[in-house]
Amino acid sequence: ADACSGLQGFLIFHSFGGGTGSGFTSLLMERLSVDYGKKSKLEFAIYPAPQVSTAVVEPYNSILTTHTTLEHSDCAFMVDNEAIYDICCRNLDIERPTYTNLNRLISQIVSSITASLRFDGALNVDLTEFQTNLVPYPRIHFPLVTYAPIISSERAYHEQLSVAEITSSCFEPNNQMVKCDPRHGKYMACCMLYRGDVVPKDVNVAIAAIKTKRNIQFVDWCPTGVKVGINYQPPTVVPGGDLAQVQRAVCMLSNTTAIAEAWARLDHKFDLMYAKRAFVHWYVSEGMEEGEFAEAREDLAALEKDYEEVGTDSFEDENDEE
């Protein structure tokens, strides 16, 4: 950072489930808050998949790290391995995706998010602007990430997708990087980052079409503004990789109450193990206290509650008060 003339912030890549990904990251985030208090910290967090598991103690690690980093992180983009596995199988016809396949998909998202810092465009969005537009309350900083088009090289020869098509596919649960259903939640904020051969007029038409759909709900206390970024640099892909070279792509970042589903799933798994105090001795022998588990779990329960509250309509609250 000392060699950097205009430090904007930090991008931190880690997993929730592993010991290093959760434990070391928590320590690092705390140190960064002390040493670089004002700089933004964006996380790309690999969230434990609902069905497949790499470690039995994933729920513990995830909840402990979320609790510890909640106040230190400005924005955390969640990605879950299972969602990406499914996308690789379904959209790219890869029977047994490897970590390389998964990482190439995630790297497209990171590339889209940072493109505005690196290239020129009609509407550029920088790192701090993301936070301003996506985070209505400090704790509610877990946007859902969707990317389109995800098509294999074979299929791209005979189909180039329009702006309207890639925009509408962003609202399909199948293209999301976390397993949850936005049709069950409400959108608080939405950011569309287009790149390649895209003009503002097409974007406006596409977004207007989305807003007429009834199954996409915004909270009533937030104007249904969609923040748009357009970058003229077309998406680049790894030569010989799985993804097709396309003329245009979009990455959607949306803050939706549906992501609370993911927390609820994780909390449930935590509760099942913690009720029996299973595996807790490993943590205690490393110097942790058992009380820290309960504290972290309470914080997550509060986070679920926060999501529930922001999703309720404001006129309901007024009626309650009367």
Curated annotation (Swiss-Prot):
Single Gene Ontology BP annotation: microtubule cytoskeleton organization
SMART domains: Tubulin, Tubulin_C
Cited PROSITE patterns: TUBULIN (PS00227)
PTM comment: Some glutamate residues at the C-terminus are polyglycylated, resulting in polyglycine chains on the gamma-carboxyl group. Glycylation is mainly limited to tubulin incorporated into axonemes (cilia and flagella) whereas glutamylation is prevalent in neuronal cells, centrioles, axonemes, and the mitotic spindle. Both modifications can coexist on the same protein on adjacent residues, and lowering polyglycylation levels increases polyglutamylation, and reciprocally. The precise function of polyglycylation is still unclear. Some glutamate residues at the C-terminus are polyglutamylated, resulting in polyglutamate chains on the gamma-carboxyl group. Polyglutamylation plays a key role in microtubule severing by spastin (SPAST). SPAST preferentially recognizes and acts on microtubules decorated with short polyglutamate tails: severing activity by SPAST increases as the number of glutamates per tubulin rises from one to eight, but decreases beyond this glutamylation threshold.
Functional note: Tubulin is the major constituent of microtubules, a cylinder consisting of laterally associated linear protofilaments composed of alpha- and beta-tubulin heterodimers. Microtubules grow by the addition of GTP-tubulin dimers to the microtubule end, where a stabilizing cap forms. Below the cap, tubulin dimers are in GDP-bound state, owing to GTPase activity of alpha-tubulin.
UniProt miscellaneous comment: This tubulin does not have a C-terminal tyrosine.
Oligomeric and partner information: Dimer of alpha and beta chains. A typical microtubule is a hollow water-filled tube with an outer diameter of 25 nm and an inner diameter of 15 nM. Alpha-beta heterodimers associate head-to-tail to form protofilaments running lengthwise along the microtubule wall with the beta-tubulin subunit facing the microtubule plus end conferring a structural polarity. Microtubules usually have 13 protofilaments but different protofilament numbers can be found in some organisms and specialized cells.
Protein name (database record): Tubulin alpha-4 chain
Organism: Gallus gallus
Lineage: Eukaryota, Metazoa, Chordata, Craniata, Vertebrata
